[in-house]
């Protein structure tokens, strides 16, 4: 575990957490949650194992968290994520663990969801002096590179003053997760995009690093979910 004050971490503390994991040769598990019960289970497991952890919500998980009684699906996705974040903020320090609070894959259609969460995040930061979420993810890997980087730059410009980090995706991860997926795990498809290209990473670094902190979800042939035997070639 990193030698940090327990609770939700962000900014320099987030970098310290990642640095401790690298130095200690261990991974930070990222666990998707969809209810207060699953959040509590993750916190309890982390505390028992004296391990820091990433707690994250997909858009569907956030909607489920808000409950089926909310008929406005978009509002449910926003309020569910905010409610879950507040729950983690309240309890994490009492479990004695450091938590990176993150939202999972958001494609082009979910950019408004991320922006709505930033609206809440800016209000939270103004009141508490810290961000609501540690980081968000934009998965625009199916879109042209220029659109991917320009949108990531625009969103990161909002996030940087809040001491938040942005996760981006370069190269397509095959399969599907919570409705966000790609069909390139099919053996008949041209799967060259399943492998992140070094020149794309360099371009992202040159474009985004002057704005704020970001991380890259790199693809090396890995896929989400179920796939046919022989179709996955990791390299």
Which ranges hold each PLM region?
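N-terminal amphipathic alpha-helix/helix-capping segment at the start of soluble metabolic enzymes
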Residues: 1-29
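Short catalytic-loop micro-motif centered on adjacent basic/acidic residues
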Residues: 28-32, 101-103, 137
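Alpha/beta enzyme core
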Residues: 12-20, 36-96, 107-235
């Amino acid at each position: 575990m990193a030698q940090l004050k327990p609770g939700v971490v962000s900014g320099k503390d987030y970098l310290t957490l990642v640095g401790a994991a690298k130095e200690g040769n261990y991974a930070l598990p990222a666990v998707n949650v969809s209810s207060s019960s699953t959040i509590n289970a993750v916190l309890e497991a982390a505390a028992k194992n004296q391990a820091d952890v990433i707690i994250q919500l997909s858009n569907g998980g956030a909607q489920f968290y808000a409950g089926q009684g909310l008929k406005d699906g978009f509002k449910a996705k926003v309020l569910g994520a905010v409610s879950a974040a507040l729950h983690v903020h309240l309890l994490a320090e009492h479990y004695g663990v450091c938590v990176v609070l993150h939202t999972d894959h958001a494609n082009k259609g979910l950019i408004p969801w991320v922006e709505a969460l930033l609206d809440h995040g800016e209000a939270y930061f103004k009141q508490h002096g810290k961000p609501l979420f540690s980081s968000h993810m934009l998965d625009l890997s199916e879109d042209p590179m220029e659109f991917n980087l320009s949108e990531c730059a625009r969103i990161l410009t909002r996030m940087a003053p809040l001491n938040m980090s942005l996760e981006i995706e370069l190269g397509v991860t095959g399969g599907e997760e919570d409705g966000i997926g790609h069909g390139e795990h099919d053996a008949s498809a041209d799967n060259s995009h399943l492998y992140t290209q070094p020149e794309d990473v360099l371009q992202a670094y040159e474009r985004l690093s002057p704005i704020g902190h970001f991380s890259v979800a790199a693809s090396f042939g890995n896929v989400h979910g179920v796939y046919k035997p022989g179709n996955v070639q990791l390299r």
